[in-house]
């Protein structure tokens, strides 16, 4: 039996690949740049600081060398070691999913920029977990005696990427 729905009555699918002139490889190269910057700064800190050492930079910011065996805010840091491989696997799964998203949504520049930042940050921290068994953190912001948990360039990239994803979605919703 023939369908009674006409072709023009179906909702138009957005062609996510047609707009823009970027490729997934460009976005992955940007993610690789994030990984390289993250690892560069971590290597500099590891070579010039001893564990736990803190050097003031401003009245609210120190450079430090600390290790995080857990996730954000040291979540599960004392879990006994299994978390290293759990978070490594999670980072790899998230990375693979993001690569798939980059192929699927290449023309959405802000979206791809955001997930490329997240990809670079995730891979940067996965490298630490595989090579060192923990993530190297070195940025310490504080107010008086309250210190925000130390973090690194990869964490910054993940956070900025997440904020940009929210901005991208809000812009997309506002258009409709």
From Swiss-Prot:
EC number: 3.4.23.36
Transmembrane regions: 26-46, 60-80, 82-102, 107-127, 147-167
GO molecular function, one term: aspartic-type endopeptidase activity
Pathway of action: Protein modification; lipoprotein biosynthesis (signal peptide cleavage)
Keywords per UniProt: Aspartyl protease, Cell inner membrane, Cell membrane, Hydrolase, Membrane, Protease, Transmembrane, Transmembrane helix
GO cellular component: plasma membrane
KW Membrane (keyword) present: yes
Similarity comment text for this entry: Belongs to the peptidase A8 family.
Protein name: Lipoprotein signal peptidase
Organism of this sequence: Cupriavidus pinatubonensis (strain JMP 134 / LMG 1197) (Cupriavidus necator (strain JMP 134))
Phylogenetic classification of the source organism: Bacteria, Pseudomonadati, Pseudomonadota, Betaproteobacteria, Burkholderiales
